[in-house]
């Protein structure tokens, strides 16, 4: 579509296809851009460590490459976490934020959800040196076990108008 840019950021272990059913709707009013995060979808992993901070820097490089000077950002789950890091690091590029299921730190996730992730991470990490699949799983699960690392003070420094979406059955703690 045309109009003000809207970046759609998917969650961990997903791709731009997460937003497939919403692209047509948003494209009526916005220039919609839905990138795949490093190591997800069609974007190669590259070298070095995967982190939310690195994904935010990748997003900066991506919007600069496209010539986007400012955009609204809708982030789901880790996409919301990336959006927060991006807004803190590159505030001049952010119009408005929509954070759906984002969290500030790993303890913000309900224990009933986080515990199986932690167990899976430990198992995958144990086998990571013997299996490329286990290594990839350990990296992806590691993002959910170890990140993001933001504080309430960090969140208060986000200057863009922000809509936070949380559902009744959300995996993020209401108090978070």
Q: Where do the protein language model's features map onto the residues?
A:
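Conserved HGGG/HGGXW glycine-rich cap/lid loop of the alpha/beta-hydrolase fold
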Residues: 1-42
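Glycine-rich His-Gly loop
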Residues: 8-11, 77, 167
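A short beta-to-alpha transition loop/helix N-cap that caps and shapes the active-site region
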Residues: 42, 102-113
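Conserved acidic catalytic loop of the alpha/beta-hydrolase fold
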Residues: 53-71
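Conserved hydrolase catalytic core segment
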Residues: 69-107
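The alpha/beta-hydrolase serine catalytic core
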Residues: 112-153, 157
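Short beta-strand/loop motif that positions the catalytic acidic residue
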Residues: 158, 164-166
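Conserved alpha/beta-hydrolase "acid-adjacent" motif
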Residues: 171-176
């Amino acid at each position: 579509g045309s109009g003000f840019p809207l970046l759609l950021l998917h969650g961990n272990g997903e791709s731009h296809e997460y937003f497939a059913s919403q692209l047509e709707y948003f494209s009526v009013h916005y220039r919609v851009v839905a990138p795949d995060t490093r190591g997800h979808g069609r974007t190669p992993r590259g070298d070095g460590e995967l982190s939310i901070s690195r994904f935010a820097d990748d997003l900066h490089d991506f919007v600069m490459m496209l010539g986007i000077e400012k955009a609204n950002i809708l982030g789901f789950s880790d996409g919301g976490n990336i959006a927060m890091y991006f807004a803190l690091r590159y505030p001049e590029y952010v119009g408005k934020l929509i954070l759906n299921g984002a969290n500030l730190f790993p303890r913000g996730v309900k224990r009933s959800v986080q515990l199986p992730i932690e167990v899976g991470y430990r198992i995958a990490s144990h086998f990571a040196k013997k299996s490329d699949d286990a290594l990839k799983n350990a990296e992806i699960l590691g993002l959910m076990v170890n990140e993001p690392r933001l504080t309430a003070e960090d969140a208060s420094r986000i200057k863009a108008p922000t809509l936070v979406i949380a559902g009744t059955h959300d995996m993020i703690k209401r108090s978070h």
